[in-house]
Design a protein with these regions (language model features):
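Active-site acidic Asp-centered loop
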Residues: 36-39
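Short aromatic/hydrophobic "clamp" motif used to bind/position activated sugar donors
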Residues: 33
Length: 193
């Protein structure tokens, strides 16, 4: 984030993702909380600033569109925590929903379910391109299209996914280098729709 001159608070904790998100939100003392996972690269400073502003102006949240393909109905599009900005007022209005995985929800999906049930509008960035299929096969984004390893959302953020695999980690290092050296390109990527 230094490349974009953005001040970031990094944390290192060996806890489940949803538990960590609950911990962060439970201690938030600012108007907007932003989460950027370590395998996600904003492609510009402006997308971060725009997302902060959008969450503030809407008194809601914004995130990358995702579907939990392993949890029925495998069609619910929600704002994933990979790139996620939420107003703390909105979070409190919703009754502080947990980010933990639940029967119907993957990590952070319950937040979107709660917003939908309460009639709170939120925004998602949809995938535009991706580099390759995951080992288990391509991921469907409900009826919208597809995403996979190295997905670009809204032409503005790059999310690697599955960084635990060495080949993906090498790809991520390359993409970080591309962004820092102003040569990131989606040439050779597959369209999501």
């Amino acid at each position: 984030m230094q490349h974009f001159n953005l001040n970031v608070q990094y944390t290192e904790a060996n806890v489940p993702h949803g538990e960590w998100l609950d911990w962060v939100m439970g201690r938030a003392q600012c108007k907007i909380v932003g989460i950027i996972e370590p395998d996600l690269i904003p492609l510009s400073r402006q997308i971060v600033l725009n997302s902060i502003n959008l969450a503030y102006q809407m008194n809601s949240f914004v995130g990358c569109a995702q579907v939990s393909n392993h949890i029925p109905p495998a069609a619910h599009i929600f704002a994933s925590p990979a790139f996620f900005f939420i107003s703390t007022d909105c979070y409190q209005r919703m009754g502080k929903p947990s980010f933990l995985e639940m029967g119907r929800a993957d990590v952070a999906e319950e937040v979107s379910y709660r917003a939908e049930e309460m009639g709170i509008h939120y925004r998602t960035l949809f995938p535009t391109h991706f580099e390759r299929e995951p080992l288990e096969g391509i991921w469907r984004l409900s009826s919208y299209g597809y995403y996979g390893i190295g997905t670009v959302f809204g032409n503005q953020v790059y999310h690697l996914f599955q960084s635990r695999y060495d080949t993906n980690a090498d790809l991520f290092i390359q993409r970080c280098d591309d962004v820092v050296n102003n040569r990131f390109s989606m040439e050779g990527f597959r369209p999501s729709i």
